[in-house]
Amino acid sequence: MFYPEHFDVIVIGGGHAGTEAAMAAARMGRQTLLLTHNIDTLGQMSCNPAIGGIGKGHLVKEIDAMGGLMATAIDHAGIQFRTLNASKGPAVRATRAQADRVLYRQAIRTTLENQPNLMIFQQPVEDLIVENDQVTGAVTRMGLKFRAKAVVLTVGTFLDGKIHIGLENYSGGRAGDPPSVSLSHRLRELPLRVGRLKTGTPPRIDARTIDFSQLAPQLGDNPMPVFSFLGNVDQHPEQMPCHITHTNEQTHEIIRNNLERSPMYAGVIEGIGPRYCPSIEDKVMRFADRNSHQIFLEPEGLTSNEIYPNGISTSLPFDVQMQIVNSMKGMENAKIIRPGYAIEYDFFDPRDLKQTLESKFINGLFFAGQINGTTGYEEAAAQGLLAGLNAARYAFDQEGWFPRRDQAYIGVLVDDLCTLGTKEPYRMFTSRAEYRLMLREDNADLRLTEIGRELGMVDDNRWAQFSEKVELVEKERQRLRDIWVHPKADNLEEINQLLKTPLSKEANGEDLLRRPEMTYEILKKIPRFAPGIDDSRPQAAEQVEIQVKYEGYINRQQEEIEKQLRNESAALPIDIDYKQVSGLSNEVIAKLNDHKPTSIGQASRISGVTPAAISILLVWLKKQGLLRRSAS
C-alpha cells in the first residue's frame, strides 16, 4: 500500500549522514521523511567515541556554520575537548572531543524529534521506486510505499554488510544490526558502478579490569574549546581523562604467529580498508621496524565502564584478541566485553555523482556518507548536509549548489570524490586542500553562514549572532587602524618595552598587531588601545588577530584563487561524447568519457588530462555554444 502523505524528500538511514540530510531538508521547509531501521540508533557512533581532529574538525565547523547539528550535539556530549596543533598556525589547528555515546545519541534524537517538517518512521527499506530514470519513492520491508520528489541514500556499512571475526563471518550492518541485502541487490540493478570496501573496530574493554595506575593520563585542554559557533563551555558535561598504553614486541609476536587466522591475510576479505586507520595486524606488518605502537584508552561515556582502545582495530579471532589486549602494560588482567571485528560492505563509485551528490543516471537520487567510499562520522555528516540541501532544492525545481574547493573542506571532499573517485575509504586531511589558509576552523562561519542563510538553512538566532560578530570585528579593525602612534611622541616607553625593536616610524594599531611578538590580548591592555573587544567575545577577538596578522598571506592566496576560478566555473554538459572533440588523445577521451566531469576545473584535476587538452576543450565548447557558468 502507499502511505497517504506525499513527501518532498525521503532520507534512508539515520546515521551521521542521514540525520544531517534530514535536518537540512526540513530546515529548508520541505516535508521530509527519515526512514531508519531503528529509531533508537539515530546518530549512533558505530566506531570510535570522538568527533573532530585534523581536517575533520574543519568539516564539523563548516557543518555548524550552515546550520547543521553535529557541532551542537558534541558540545552537549563531549567529555574531553582538545585543540590539536595548537602551537601551529591557525590553518591547521583542529578541535577534537571525546564523546559520551549515549549523550551524543540523545542530543541528535532530541533535535530531530523537535524539528518542524520532519517525520521519522522505523522500517528497513528494501527497494526504490524508479520510473523513467527518476526516483519517486521507497518501499519498506512490510511493503509500505512512500512517495517523494527526491530520495537521499545514507545507508553506511549496511549494504550487503558482512562481519568478520577470525575466519568466521556472518551478515550484518554493524554488530547487533542486520544488513540491507535486498536494497543492495536492487541498487546493483541500476546503472551504477559498485565496489566493496572494508573497515574495522577494536575490542571494547571493561574499565574496571584495567590498572590505570600504570598508565599515563591524557587530559583535555583548559580552557576548553567549543565546536559550535553558538556554543559555550557551560554546555559541556563532566570531563574525563584518556590514558595511554603501548603495544610491545610480545604483542607483535602474538600477531605475527596468528596471521594465517586473519581474514585479511587469509584472503577471505576482498574489500580494501582505510589507509589512515589500519588494523593492528596491518600496522605490525607494514611497519615491521617499529617495536611499539601508541594505544589511546578512550572512555565511552560518563555512565559506562566500556573503554575504546584506539589503535588496535582487528579482525583476528577472539582468543588472539585476548592475548593482544593482555600483552600491554596496565592491561594484563583486562577483560574484553565486545570483540573487535572487520566489516565489508558495498559502496558506489562517487564519480557517478554530480557535485551536488545527485546521481548522474537516476534523477532525484542522492548519495551521502560511506556509500560514497568515505570513512568517518564527519565526512559522512558533511555529505549528508550537502545531499539534503540539494535534495530539498531539487524537490522545488531549484538549481543545485555545492561549495568550491576554495570555499570549504566540504568542497574539497566532494570534488575529490566526484572527480577522482576512490579505491579505499577516503578521509579528510588539511593536506588535501590547496587553500588551507583560507579554509580555517575559525572562519568557517565567515565563509559559509551567509550562503547557508540564502539557502534557507540558517535560522534567525544564528544569523543575528553571526551578523553581530562580523560587525564587531569590522568596527574593531577600523578602530585599530584609526589609532596612530609616532616614534617621537611622549609616553611611548610602555609600547617599546613590548616590542623587540622600538618604533622607528609612525604606526597604527594594526601595524603593531602584525609584529610577531604582539598579540591582541597584549595590545588591548595598552591604555591607548584599550578597551578592545570584551573577553566574553573570544571568537571576535581571535578573528581580529588572525585577519590582521595573516592579511598579506591571505591576499596572495586570494589572488591565486581568482586566477584558478577563471576556468573552474566553465560547466560541462554530462552527455558530451568526447570522441567528437578533435585534437584530444585517445587516453584523454577515455578518461573524460569515464569520469564525465561537470566542469572544466573538475576535468583538469583528472589524472592524465593535460593543460593542452583543457585548452582544446575550451575552444570546442565555445564553438559549440556550450560554454556556461556552473551552479556554484
From Swiss-Prot:
**Any idea which positions bind FAD?**
13-18, 125, 180, 370
Q: Where in the cell is it found?
A: Cytoplasm
Query: Which Pfam family, an example, fits this chain?
Result: GIDA
Sample GO molecular function, one term: flavin adenine dinucleotide binding
Q: Which Gene3D superfamilies match?
A: FAD/NAD(P)-binding domain, GidA associated domain, C-terminal subdomain, tRNA uridine 5-carboxymethylaminomethyl modification enzyme MnmG/GidA
Its cellular-component GO annotations read: cytosol
Keywords of this protein's UniProt record, alphabetized?
Cytoplasm, FAD, Flavoprotein, NAD, tRNA processing
Q: Name one GO biological process term.
A: tRNA wobble uridine modification
Binding-site list for NAD(+)? 273-287
Q: Which cofactor does it need?
A: FAD
Which PANTHER family does UniProt cross-reference here? GLUCOSE INHIBITED DIVISION PROTEIN A (PTHR11806), PROTEIN MTO1 HOMOLOG, MITOCHONDRIAL (PTHR11806:SF0)
Please give the function described in this protein's UniProt entry: NAD-binding protein involved in the addition of a carboxymethylaminomethyl (cmnm) group at the wobble position (U34) of certain tRNAs, forming tRNA-cmnm(5)s(2)U34.
What's the subunit arrangement here?
A: Homodimer. Heterotetramer of two MnmE and two MnmG subunits.
Q: Which family does it belong to?
A: Belongs to the MnmG family.
Task: Name the chain's protein.
Answer: tRNA uridine 5-carboxymethylaminomethyl modification enzyme MnmG
* Species per Swiss-Prot/TrEMBL record: Proteus mirabilis (strain HI4320)
